[in-house]
Each structure stands twice: as structure tokens, then as C-alpha cells.
Swiss-Prot record:
Annotated residues for binding of Zn(2+) 2: D60, H61, D132, H170
UniProt keyword list: Hydrolase, Metal-binding, Zinc
GO MF term (any one): hydroxyacylglutathione hydrolase activity
Cofactor binding notes: Binds 2 Zn(2+) ions per subunit.
One GO term of the biological process aspect: methylglyoxal catabolic process to D-lactate via S-lactoyl-glutathione
HAMAP family, alphabetized: Glyoxalase_2 (MF_01374)
Listed name of the protein: Hydroxyacylglutathione hydrolase
Oligomeric and partner information: Monomer.
Purpose: Thiolesterase that catalyzes the hydrolysis of S-D-lactoyl-glutathione to form glutathione and D-lactic acid.
Pfam families: HAGH_C, Lactamase_B
First-tier enzyme category under EC: hydrolase
Organism: Pseudomonas aeruginosa (strain ATCC 15692 / DSM 22644 / CIP 104116 / JCM 14847 / LMG 12228 / 1C / PRS 101 / PAO1)
Origin superkingdom: Bacteria
Length: 258
């Protein structure tokens, strides 16, 4: 049984910590800062960091990799098409890799960056570590990829089982939900989610992980085929957007300035 906890980093990052209590081994996802992981390891001296999983090359996701590799000798896994510090295993789309006894399938999900990958573990309750591609009620900015690429990546993730747990790496949920409400003010599920997320943050609790089912009902970037979302995108752009990709592009540009 793998336990998954969040180690907060910087202002709003989460480093996901996977723990196998039987073997006393652990793994981390996107350690942008080594210090939270080092502190956890110091408080758990009988545990060993065996693996470091990286989704993309941005500093707030890889800044702690080299130090943790030097400290622990952990294996570093990351996208083949990006420059990842101390990488031992370069991963391509469709490959499978075992971490703490869990087999993860690698998805290439370009958009936020061109080489971005996600780690998917199919199970009774599937797990998805998706970096800055799919957020709770949102998606990552397009620093390198195109709207069409990101739309395709998100559609791929949206097609995963509805109960897939979504582990993204930023606490952006409330700001994303505010934008989502601007897109779909009459979405009752969205209003309910906003109220629940507000209660969680008022108690300084995290809003993650999410689930694919929740994203499908409340994330505007996964709802670009819905009439309500298309209508708002058409109003925003002043023209008829004929494809889901065009609707997505309008929403993403709007969110960038929201």
C-alpha cells in the first residue's frame, strides 16, 4: 500500500511524496526545492529515497533534483526530450517504469512545455501525476506548445477512468475556479466546488488531489465542447469558434489575462 502526501514548497508548489511502508522506501515527484524532502528524510532516518520523478524542466520542478541525487543516490526519471538535471532514465511516450512496485505508463503531454510528460498508474483507483498540464479546474500556461497541442494533451488525460486521482503540482485551485465561474456562472457543480475549496483553504488545507470526474464537470478547459463554454468563448472573441481547439485557445488566452 502506497501512501501519498504533499510536501509544500515555495508559495504554492507541492512535491508529492510516495511512501512504501513495507520497504521503507519513498519517491518524490517534481522536487523544485530539496529542503522539504531533506527535512522529511531527516525526520524519518530509516527511510530511503529511491526515485525522483520529473514531469518537465522548469526550475520550480527540478531545482532540488541534483542535491537530492547527491544526498541519496536516488534514480532520476524524466522526459527524454528535455534537459533534466542528473537524469538516469529518459522516458518516452508509451514506456512503462516501475517505482515502489507500481508500474507507471508515460504519457507525452506537450503544451506547457514541449517535452512534458505525465505518469499514469492504472489500478482500481488510478493515479496520475501530471505536473503543470492539468490543474484542479484549470491547465498550465502555454510556455512552449500550441493551443492545439495542449488541447490534445488534456483530451488524452480527460479520457482516463473517471475515478483517476489527479496529482498536479500547484495550489491554484481557487483562482482557477474563479475563472471557471466567469466562464460558466450557472454551473451548479462548479459553485459547489468553489465553496468547498474556499472552506478547505480557510482551514489551510490543500485542495488536491482532484479526480477526472470532478474535472469533467467543473474544469472549463475539459468542457470546450459544451454549448455553455463555446457560447462564452464566442462572446469573448467576437466570432464563431468552430472547433473545440479554437474554443480552448480563446479560453487559454482569456485566462492568461484574468
Amino acid at each position: 500500500m502506497i501512501q501519498i502526501d504533499a510536501l509544500p514548497a515555495f508559495n504554492d508548489n507541492y512535491i508529492w511524496l510516495l511512501q512504501d511502508a513495507t520497504s521503507r522506501r519513498c519517491a518524490v515527484v517534481d522536487p523544485g526545492d530539496a529542503k522539504p524532502v531533506e527535512a522529511w528524510l531527516a525526520a524519518h532516518p530509516d527511510w530511503r529515497l529511491s526515485d525522483i520523478l520529473v514531469t518537465h524542466h522548469h526550475h520550480d520542478h527540478v531545482g532540488g533534483v541534483a542535491a537530492l541525487k547527491e544526498l541519496t543516490g536516488a534514480r532520476v526519471l524524466g522526459p527524454a526530450n528535455e534537459k533534466i538535471p542528473a537524469r538516469d532514465l529518459a522516458l518516452e511516450d508509451g514506456e512503462r517504469v516501475e517505482v515502489l512496485g507500481l508500474v507507471f505508463e508515460i504519457f507525452h503531454v506537450p503544451g506547457h512545455t514541449l517535452g512534458h510528460i505525465a505518469y499514469y498508474h492504472p489500478a482500481e483507483t488510478p493515479l496520475l501525476f501530471c505536473g503543470d498540464t492539468l490543474f484542479a479546474a484549470g491547465c498550465g500556461r502555454l510556455f512552449e506548445g500550441t493551443p492545439a497541442q495542449m488541447h490534445h494533451s488534456l483530451a488524452r488525460l480527460a479520457a482516463l477512468p473517471a475515478n483517476t486521482r489527479v496529482y498536479c503540482t500547484h495550489e491554484y485551485t481557487l483562482s482557477n475556479l474563479r475563472f471557471a465561474l466567469a466562464v460558466e456562472p450557472d454551473n451548479a457543480a462548479l459553485r459547489e466546488r468553489f465553496e468547498e475549496a474556499t472552506r478547505l483553504r480557510e482551514r489551510d488545507r490543500i485542495t488536491l488531489p482532484s479526480e477526472i470526474s470532478l474535472e469533467l464537470s467543473t474544469n472549463p478547459f475539459l468542457r470546450v465542447s459544451e454549448n455553455s463554454v463555446k457560447k462564452k468563448a464566442d462572446q469573448r472573441s467576437g466570432q464563431q469558434n468552430r472547433t473545440p481547439e479554437e474554443v480552448f485557445a480563446v479560453l487559454r488566452a482569456w485566462k492568461d489575462q484574468f
